[in-house]
Each structure stands twice: as C-alpha cells, then as structure tokens.
Amino acid sequence: FFFFSDVQGDYDEEILKLGGEIYHMPSFRGYNYFDLFRKFQTFFESHPYKIVHGHIGSLSPAYLYCAKKNDAFAIVHSHATNSSILWERVVFWILSHRVTKIADFFFACSDKAGKDMFGKKIIKQENFKVLKNCIDAMEFQYSIERHEKLKKQFGLEGKLVFGHVGRFTEAKNHKFLLDVFESICMRCDNAMLILVGRGELENSIKKIVSNKKLGNKVQFLGVRDDVPNMMNLFDVFVFTSVFEGLGNVCIEAQAAGLPCFVSSAIQNEAIVSNHVWRFPLEWDNEKWAISILNHLKHFVRKDGTQDIINAGYDSSQMAHLLEEFYCSHV
C-alpha cells in the first residue's frame, strides 16, 4: 500500500496484521510534482511489482508511467464523479486525463465515475469495468434488539436519530444538511443529528451548529471504526452531497434497513432497495424537511442485507472476482 501522507491511516494496523506493507510519500502540493516523479522512478525501480492498482486520480499518470516502465500491469481506478466547481474540474482533468494513454486497465465505481475521469470512449472498451464499492453486508444486519441496545448505549432512547457519515468537505454539503435538520427540529422536538467523520470544514460546521443554537441537538462523533453500529444506531439517513462517485455510505445505510433521503448526486447504481428517496438540491431546506417527515410517517424498518447481496455489493463476492483478475495478469 502506497500513501501520499505521513499520517497513520485508519486501516494501517489491519493491513500490517494481515502481512501487507505500507509505503509513504509526501502529499501532492502542485509545486512538488517533479520531486514526486523522481521518487516514483526510484521506488518502482527498487520494487518490481507485477501489478499496480492506482486510486489517486491527479497523480495517476505519473506513478503509473513509472510503474509501467518497470514492467508492471497498470490499473487506474476512478472513485468519484466530477466536481460541481469549474476550476476543480479543469485542474483535475489537466492532471489526470493523460492516464488514458498510460493505463492498461480502467476500473470505476460507476459508469458516470468512469466517463468523468476517462471519457466516453474508454468506458466502451473491453479494458474498462465497473468494480462495485462493496461492503461486508452481514456486519450491517439490522435487528430491533441491536438498535435499542445502541440507543441506550449512546443515551438516545426516545430520540429520532438522523445520521450522516462522511468527510467534512464542500462535496458533502454539511451546511445544507444543517439547514434541513434545523427545519426538521421546528417540526419534531425529539430529533437528534449524529455526524460521523473528520475533515477540513469540521470546525466551520461546528460554528454553524453553535450559531443555529443546535448544540444540544447535534453530536460530532469523529472517525469511527464501527460504522455498522452507527448505521444501526440511526433511525434515518440523510445525505446531501453535491457530487459522489457512487455514494457508498448509502449502500451501507440500505444494508442496515434505514430510510435514506439523498441528493440527486447519488448514482442510480447505489440505489438497490425501495427505501431510498432522491431529492434535488434545487429544493429548499423546508421542502426537504417536510418531505422527509411525510415519508417517515409510513415507513417500517426491516433488515436490508439481502438487497445488498442481490445487487452484487457484498465484499465476499467482489473479493473473489478481483482476486481472479489479479491472478490472470501476473
């Protein structure tokens, strides 16, 4: 595993325990592109891996070029659709688009994520494949006993718990989420909002919570290693993203049987059950809030793991397919 950070990752311990190796490079800052390129050259000359599977779009042309020069089979993997911000799209395209001339194979979490990163031509080729972002479905299995136990553990008995899992970035649109939740609170006295994740905008979101006087209604739980429990703690999942490659947490929420109220940025491939409602971001917070509460009046929760398995999003299935793919290219 090759990371562009010196910070310990959430999965480092598990990777090392399973026998994996972790290498670190400096974060990409723009001005250090050529220094990183030289480091890539040195690294792949001394580490002759047979397959390199790249997940960092903007630098993928550089490190996959160096890997291919040392006889690696080069895979590039798109996990996100285009940003809604023009300058971000332009910069990303300039840095990443050359990978279409370098990579041997192209993966994406959805057709749209593939088209946005690689173009329409690539996604029609035989060396492109949608590789679903899978989960261990059974970890999210819902039961009323599990739900009530978690409610008691977190002191949320008698509360209607709205939940969100995601980094605090512009893409996740937490500000609008808080606007929606504020409108919900005006109509629902027992509403609570749980925010799971970290990110550069976390402090600014906390200030908004304070300014809205929602401090006793919103809890920040940081990064968690028990997301399946979080999904079983929640009563409602709300996801107001501006853009998403797929919307993987929406799949996790469906596995736990949650009613999911998401933005139209969520891809069709991520909707695998009949308890997801997509609302346009053009709607104001009042319309979101009223629509959510109206749907909840008639919702009956049940376990959703079979929906996930049927849709091919269970990790045990995908791990086998990816293993076969790697073995066929060694």
Question: What is each model feature region?
Answer:
Residues 1-35, 127, 200, 325:
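N-terminal strand-loop element at the rim of the active site
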Residues 2-4, 250, 259-263, 268:
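Short hydrophobic beta-strand element within catalytic cores of glycosyltransferases
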Residues 54-62, 78:
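Short His-centered aromatic/hydrophobic patch
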Residues 102-141:
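A short, active-site helix/loop in glycosyltransferases that binds the activated sugar's phosphate group
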Residues 141-155:
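A short helix/loop element that forms part of the nucleotide-sugar donor recognition site in Leloir-type
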Residues 160, 164-183, 200-207:
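A conserved mid-protein helix/loop that constitutes part of the nucleotide-sugar donor-binding site
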Residues 223, 242:
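Aromatic "clamp/platform" in nucleotide-sugar-dependent glycosyltransferases that forms part
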